[in-house]
């Protein structure tokens, strides 16, 4: 019998990868339910398309690499990648976009590096950024939440729009995006950025229907709170650690508060930053990816804080309304450096 001598640390975790991934999938249920409630059945269709695409793409690559397909697919990582991408894109985006983004995420951003545990970047966010850069119009065509929408597509209409671009009655995305004020709606972050650049005051912007929510943007505040609830459950289950979400949210809130105090006429308030866009999804479900995040506790705090700073900078001064995906990928780049300088010193050895 040949024994393999592995390098330290010699740790043991009874939880398998598949179970951790399953817990994350279960924790996503409140967020998915909220998106279905406010944005319609399109989200469910996108999740199904992304899940099937992710499994097929992973199976194809594993077959080509002559690895066990069944054993690898059981780790649920491909399903999670597909789900995270599906809930990040507009619910009525064309079917081929979610398929393209998912296949790119699984094959290029994950399997090309060697598979789970080898990829330096979050695969779902790679797929998202590729779609955002390639198809910016489609990727920013979000429907207004149901509470301010004029035309609410049903399940059949959602399928029709995703696969053909039109509802059963002949309506298109321009019709479906109309709000109660007769104007095509965008996300709270997109609306704020566009309106500020157009010279509108913050007082005027806050009167728009998209900001009719109690805390932040209509619908979006509840979606973010739902993702927050799922994230808290993950913490309770010890599936993730608190360092990254806390440092990310605290840094984002601190930067947003300081910016808002110094320039209230051009920068969004803290509650808009915290409860709009993909803030809570990013904090608890994307940044906490154990493969692409820092591995030390101090490193996790730095990693989360860096991502929070980058999100605020991109949202406030960048060309894109929501900066979570870009912030995640930029923070991923720094992980080796962060881990190098925050790794615990071995007893009896000098630091360095």
UniProtKB/Swiss-Prot annotation:
It comes from the Bacteria. Keywords: Cell inner membrane, Cell membrane, Electron transport, Flavoprotein, FMN, Membrane, Phosphoprotein, Translocase, Transmembrane, Transmembrane helix, Transport. It is found in: Cell inner membrane. Its main location: membrane. One of its GO terms (cellular component) is plasma membrane. The keyword Cell inner membrane applies. Belongs to the NqrB/RnfD family. This is Ion-translocating oxidoreductase complex subunit D. It comes from Escherichia coli O17:K52:H18 (strain UMN026 / ExPEC).
């Amino acid at each position: 019998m040949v024994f393999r001598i592995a390098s330290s640390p010699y740790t043991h975790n009874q939880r398998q990868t598949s179970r951790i991934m399953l817990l994350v999938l279960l924790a996503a249920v409140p967020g998915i339910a909220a998106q279905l409630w406010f944005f319609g059945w399109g989200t469910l269709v996108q999740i199904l398309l992304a899940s099937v695409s992710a499994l097929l793409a992973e199976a194809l690559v594993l077959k080509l690499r002559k690895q066990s397909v069944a054993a690898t697919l059981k780790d649920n990582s491909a399903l999670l990648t597909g789900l995270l991408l599906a809930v990040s894109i507009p619910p009525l985006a064309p079917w081929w976009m979610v398929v393209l983004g998912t296949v790119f995420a699984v094959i290029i951003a994950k399997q090309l590096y060697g598979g789970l545990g080898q990829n330096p970047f979050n695969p779902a966010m790679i797929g998202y950024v590729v779609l955002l850069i390639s198809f910016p119009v489609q990727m920013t065509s979000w429907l207004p939440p149901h509470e301010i929408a004029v035309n609410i597509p049903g399940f059949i209409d959602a399928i029709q729009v995703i696969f053909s671009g039109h509802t059963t009655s002949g309506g298109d995305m321009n019709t479906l995006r109309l709000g109660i004020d007769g104007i095509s709606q965008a996300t709270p972050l997109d609306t704020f950025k566009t309106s500020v650049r157009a010279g509108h005051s913050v007082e005027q912007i806050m009167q728009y229907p998209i900001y009719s929510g109690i805390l932040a943007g209509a619908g979006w505040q509840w979606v973010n709170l739902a993702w927050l609830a799922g994230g808290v459950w993950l913490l309770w289950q010890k599936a993730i650690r608190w360092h990254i979400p806390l440092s990310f949210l605290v840094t984002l809130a601190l930067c947003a508060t300081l910016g808002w105090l110094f320039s209230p006429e051009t920068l969004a308030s803290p509650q808009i930053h915290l409860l709009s866009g993909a803030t809570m999804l990013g904090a608890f479900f994307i940044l906490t990816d154990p493969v692409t995040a820092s591995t030390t506790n101090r490193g996790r705090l730095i990693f989360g804080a860096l991502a929070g700073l980058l999100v605020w900078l991109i949202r406030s001064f960048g060309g894109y309304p929501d900066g979570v995906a870009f912030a995640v990928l930029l923070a991923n780049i720094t992980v080796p450096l962060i881990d190098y300088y925050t790794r615990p010193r071995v007893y009896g050895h000098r630091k360095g």
